[in-house]
Amino acid sequence: LSKKLNFILIGGWACYLLTKSIKSKDIDIMVDFETLGKIKREFMLKKTPFLKKYETKIEGISVDIYVPFYSKLAIPIEEIQKNTTSLEGFKIPKPEILLILKQYAELERRDSVRDQKDRVDILNLLINRSPNMKEYQKTVRKFGLSSYPKRLREIIRSARKEFEYLGIRDLRKVKLIKKKLEAGLMP
């Protein structure tokens, strides 16, 4: 797919590429309108207005597609496009941007089955990829996401099952990781 289409991989699969753990069931991508047209010609495309995205299935796998000036994410897509990196042949957001996108997903899906997976991805990024927290702070300020650092701290403090999902069951180790993660957050 990455050889045929120009897209930015976001969501759980982008987290997986960065951390090498916890795969995702569906694929989330960002594309420009030209690429959306190519997808439309090749696959059945469904517009989901209330979620401001498009959906399709490719080889039985659900793909959520986000486009500039239509899709709503924590950070404008045009800004995400400027803050990417390449990894294993895929273009993905920088870790700080991906962390914010995962926080947005967690807030949007709060109290659903999928929000726990979002929290797992958030912790996984923090533990295994160490995003640049100065860049994170700068970005949340720039886009008026002032509640995000506080929510990030809450996610770290309240995490229990999320650590189990990551295979971390030793309570001492969990406590040490939480302490280290909180120390890494800036006020």
Where would I find each of the regions flagged by the language model?
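Compositionally biased terminal segments of proteins
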Residues: 1-187
